[in-house]
């Protein structure tokens, strides 16, 4: 079976060939800055990096640089990383904890709420210093799903409006409770859209990643389309590619996952297509004892992969216990250069939940003894 496509469009969009200019033209790159990067909500980082007062990190989207910080009042704020005196880059270190930001050029200081608080030798400015006008320029910022989102358009839609129905779809995964376990960034010599194009489709998987045939079933994936250019891809997990000959035994790559759930691989000899459903049953049955709360997730979400391609540059990949954030960013002035980021968040077992289940079982046993 080929992948299914679900979705409707108000206006029929004609198919046309995309020219290489969209990937190589400096003029097109400049148009993207105006029409896309300056208008959209973008994943800037993770909320766990700005938990304490004074915590900050820098989000670079060339040529812009944005400070995201937690103020002394515990508010979440974002500002352009630019001293308002002479336009010097204000903060060079990518993350840290500071009560105030000091410009390395003339020593102007800004509180972490953006207010200009100190101007060395201020008396030398004969007309005075208009502090309110020269405080840091704010950028819209919100925290959701354990991520920090920024938008440089002061008049644009809210984050909820930008995400639309996708917001409610992601919330059952409780990603805000997950911990960051991996943070990578690399430089690629290609246009940012080339990377997004690759990760947005599964057409290449059978040819470049043949090992995935024994993990999930790309040919039967379902693609859904949403307003704003977002898409969702649903992929059956804990199964095998339906285009391949069904193996007699469970593939080795699935053994550790089955063992963690107390499932014996020998029990599925000749019936490995039953693994997916049994994984759902086992997780539902033993999840809390293992420290995982699956109550908000559907059965399919316990075994499958859900991928959200968010316009313009983010790919969010969700499983019951893990969350990948993949992001492409333009690099410098070269259309044929970009950054590619990979963040991985994981739901760590909740010891309190495990203890609660243990206590409940102990209580049930005691009650049985009394009876």
Where are these regions (language model features)?
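Short, contiguous pre-domain boundary segments
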Residues: 6-20, 176
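Non-catalytic accessory segments flanking enzyme active sites
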Residues: 18-62, 66-67
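A broad, structural surface signal
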Residues: 30, 34, 38, 81-84, ...
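Short Pro/Gly-enriched beta-strand edge/turn motifs at strand-loop
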Residues: 38-49, 120-124, 308-312
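Rieske [2Fe-2S] iron-sulfur-binding domain
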Residues: 49-154, 158-168, 172
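C-terminal catalytic domain of Rieske-type non-heme iron oxygenases
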Residues: 75, 81, 142, 147-371
């Amino acid at each position: 079976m080929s992948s299914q496509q679900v979705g409707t469009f108000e206006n029929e969009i004609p198919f046309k060939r995309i020219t290489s200019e969209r990937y190589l033209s400096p003029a097109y790159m400049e148009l993207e800055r105006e029409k896309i990067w300056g208008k959209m909500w973008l994943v800037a980082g993770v909320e766990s990096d700005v938990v304490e007062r004074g915590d900050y990190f820098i989000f670079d989207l060339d040529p812009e640089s944005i400070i995201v910080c937690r103020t002394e009042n515990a508010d979440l704020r974002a500002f352009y990383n630019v001293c308002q005196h002479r336009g010097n880059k204000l903060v060079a270190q990518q993350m840290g904890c500071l009560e105030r930001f000091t410009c390395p050029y003339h020593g102007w200081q800004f509180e972490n709420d953006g207010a200009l608080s100190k101007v060395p030798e201020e008396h030398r400015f004969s007309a005075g210093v208009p502090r309110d006008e020269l405080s840091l320029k704010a950028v819209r910022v919100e925290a959701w799903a354990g991520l920090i989102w920024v938008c440089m358009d002061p008049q644009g839609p809210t984050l909820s409006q930008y995400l639309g129905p996708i917001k409610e779809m992601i919330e059952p995964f409780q990603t805000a409770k997950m911990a960051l376990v991996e943070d990578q960034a690399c430089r690629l010599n290609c246009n940012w859209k080339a990377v997004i194009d690759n990760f947005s489709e599964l057409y290449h998987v059978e040819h470049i990643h043949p090992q995935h045939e024994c993990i999930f079933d790309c040919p039967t994936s379902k693609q859904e389309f949403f307003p704003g250019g977002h898409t969702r891809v649903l992929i059956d997990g804990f199964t095998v590619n339906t285009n391949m000959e069904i193996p007699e035994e469970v593939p080795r790559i699935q053994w550790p996952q089955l063992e963690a759930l107390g499932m014996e691989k020998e029990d599925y000899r000749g019936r490995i297509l039953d693994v997916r459903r049994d994984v759902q049953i086992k997780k539902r049955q033993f999840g809390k004892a293992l420290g995982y709360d699956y109550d908000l997730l559907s059965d399919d979400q316990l075994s499958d992969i859900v991928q959200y391609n968010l316009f313009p540059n983010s790919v969010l990949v969700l499983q019951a216990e893990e969350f990948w954030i993949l992001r492409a960013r333009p690099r410098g002035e070269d259309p044929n250069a970009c950054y590619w980021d990979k963040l991985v968040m994981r739901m760590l077992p909740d010891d309190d939940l495990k203890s609660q289940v243990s206590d409940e079982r102990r209580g049930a046993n005691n009650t049985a003894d009394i009876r």
